[in-house]
Amino acid sequence: GLGDVYKRQMMHMQGTPQNMQKEPHYENLLKEFFIYFARKVQQLRDLGVKDIILDPGFGFGKTLEHNYELMAHLEEFGIFELPLLVGVSRKSMIYRLFGTTPQEALNGTTVLDTVALMKGADILRVHDVREAVESVRLIEKLKSVSACS
């Protein structure tokens, strides 16, 4: 079946690449996300796909506020019991907040990567590998010490 051959990363995006940033609107952001992913996950499972990775699609068809609302509630994606991929590296949700550029967004990227890891992200999509690895190692250490307490 398809599940034996294909793995799927499923990313949320409102609209198309051509219009996704033109006034994105959600009545209830989290509810709409969970309905979207529940349907898509079921469709893939019905096709026999076993390995599915969820990606909230930070920066794709979302306002600055939408992106931060998603990050604030990231742990709630755990209800799907699937790996969660987060890609915020140098995204406008960081540099627009500070009025800087993508090249100046490393510190913000590292902070949000760390927050994402603490809130359940399993995979990070990054530009700056060394810094991301440091975040992963620090969070793994923190979690290992917490588990021993």
Model region roles, listed by residue range:
Residues 1-6:
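Short, small-residue-biased leader/transition segments that mark boundaries at the very start
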Residues 7-15, 56, 82-89:
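Non-cysteine beta-strand/loop elements that form the S-adenosyl-L-methionine
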Residues 8, 52, 124-125:
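Hydrophobic residues within beta-strands of alpha/beta enzymes
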Residues 16-23, 93-98:
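A short acidic, helix-capping loop that chelates divalent metal ions and anchors anionic groups
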Residues 26-36, 58-74:
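Active-site glycine- and acidic-residue-rich loops that bind
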Residues 54, 116, 128:
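Conserved, mostly hydrophobic/aromatic
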Residues 126-149:
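C-terminal helical cap(s) of enzyme catalytic domains, especially alpha/beta-barrels
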